[in-house]
Amino acid sequence: MQNWVLLLFYFFWAFLMNAQNQLPLANASLEEIEPGTNNFVYWSNLQTNGGQVNYSIETENLIPGSSRAQKSEIISLGSNGWHVKTQSDYLFQVQSGQQYTVRFWAKVEGDNQATMKVVFQSEVQGSYQGNNKTINENWQQFSHTFTVSDDSDLNRLSFWYMDSGVTYYLDQVEVVVGKTISLNEAITYQEVDGFGAGIKRRTEHLYDLEVSLRNQIETLAFQDLEVNMIRFFIYHDLEDPNDNNNPFTLNQSALDWTRYDSNPNNWRTRYIGEALNNAFSLSINGFDHIIGNCNSAPAWMKTNGSHTNGGTLIPGFEDEYSEFLIGFLTGMSSRYNIDVTAISPTNEPDFEVSYESMNTTPEELSSILINLNNRLDDEGFSQVKVISPECFRVDSDNPSKSTTNYVNTMFEDPNVLQAVDIVATHPYQSSVTQDQWSNLKDASLEKPIWVTEAGNLGSPYTNMADASYHIERIIDGFNHGGLTAYMFHLFYEQHDYDNEISSSALVLWDSNNNILLPKRYYVFKHFANLVKGGYQRIHSSGFNNDLKIIAFKSHDDSKVIVNLFSEGSLSNVNIEIPEGAISVEHFVTSDQDENFSLITTDIFDLDNNYMSLNLGAMSMHSFVFSIDSSLSSNNDFLLDSNKVILFPNPAKSQLELSFRLSLERELIIYDVNGLEVLKKTYPKSNKIILNTEFLSSCCYSFSWRWWSK
């Protein structure tokens, strides 16, 4: 039985006219090859004037979603840069004053880096533009934006190889017009663990408030924010003094749980058990990660005899410290019915402060971690994750400071590498560059990476400029640092107007008991409420360094989330619409009245490839696309019609149609009067090459149909 679909799709061409070829580039993905050759369709490789290159097609160690890449082994260079190059043979139209962004993936072998020049040039004299890119040993996407000075119908993109003795790899090329954001769901990265914050401080202040006000604050923090992570103190005085002299026999009755209990008559009470259980009962989706963090071991275990002012663990007290942490886990479960899922034995060991702290070196911390990991297994807590080191900084030139430097040192020991389940950091340095995030990712050796505490400490502001502190760390951290989770320092705290110092918490109240919601609260909703645990980051490409972009898809492929933050105002921004999108929701937070507001006035045509919008300065935008998988994956026939490339148009002697799918097709051509001038069936292929010399100079339309058994 044959099923067939008939689709009318009209193109017009007028012969003996200059070509006006439109983007996108033909075979930009470098997937289609010429039959019987080792060359990509619409691409050519040159070696002239002494240049010598071994050109081939690579099929291994590619980026996700790719099956082929251009491989160029450079033996020697020519006398000029253009003598050794790969160029697109698809000549396309450009317009004066328009911006065109070139994106491509590349890597090199044979050296740790090499230079590749990206070139834009047409037949117009003086049209040459080139930009050098430093390519390293790992696949990476590069981009450059060209502004064209002259109109042309014959613009060409080429890649010049500028170093010999290395092998270049090139793949997934793209040229986009204007301000375009592209998505690639086939390229996936890390899986999200979640979003949250801490209650390490201020719980006693919250529980001093009237019950109705406290309930409002907790509802805002734990219900309206759809977080799934919470972090709290392991207090140093839980075991002070020593329970006994045997670190392997815990005396639970000697532990002091005052800080975790709810006793308003005791100044040391912190209501931790009640605060945690209230959070759990309010949560819509539940908490996947419940994290105990210890600033300092009990004073009697430390070199300075105090839980404050740094110091470190006395050598040989690792067993006692592990017993202390096991006692905490056991008591939280038995007393408060709370099963802690992750534990961290240090907080900012690289930061010297006067409050609760412990300045352990990487070597000292390594001993603690190995001992703790073994003890967790021995005591039946192997399911509890070990988090470390939670340094104050992501990266630093000082080798004794930062999470990156700690991890680089600690992971030299395979026992520490095995002991640590999650690499955790705080990003309190003034700024974190993309390279510093990448350094942390490399050092972490593919372990999950969490920001477990972050806040714009000391900022008196609650506007979008303050919120941008977190936006930049979240987007850059996930995009470049491999982050899988991000947590604020505190869920709630009182705002100190008198001293002009704001809290860095998510939910605030002032001295008059008025609740304040800073812009960072609404910005965090763009992530915590829209991007869930188990979602995957997907590849996204932008056009402007002032525009932060990140994208995710749900585990069942039913949603695609795109988050954007614009520092300056941008007009006519084009966002690629994912295949199979059947609806889109648009949320905005800005310095205006938009607070995670759902925009209902947008009119987007989801049948188009892109949707256009304007972005105001200092505004956060999130787009939630609902995907019908039957349209994006099963209905390939519909996609086939939307992915056709016609080249050249107008045509003189030959016309080529490239399709997404290889199918048997029947092509019918009509003249301007609607009379049939050609009807022909073509064998299964993703390309039709039509000799047009038999046609008179005129405009024509055509239709085609395909079928499958």
What are these regions (language model features)?
Residues 20-180, 555-557, 568:
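Extracellular and organelle-lumenal recognition/adhesion modules and their flexible linkers in secreted
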Residues 602-630:
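C-terminal beta-strand-rich structural cap/linker in extracellular carbohydrate-active enzymes
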Residues 181-341, 361-366, 370, 374:
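N-terminal catalytic cores of secreted or lumenal carbohydrate-active enzymes
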Residues 267-269, 418-459:
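Glycoside hydrolase catalytic-domain groove-lining segments
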Residues 636-709:
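C-terminal outer-membrane/trafficking sorting elements
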Residues 543-582, 618:
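Carbohydrate-binding surface patches
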Residues 448-525, 538-543:
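Aromatic/acidic polysaccharide-binding cleft in carbohydrate-active enzymes
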Residues 272, 300-413, 431-438, 442:
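Active-site cleft segment of glycoside hydrolase catalytic domains centered on the general acid/base Glu
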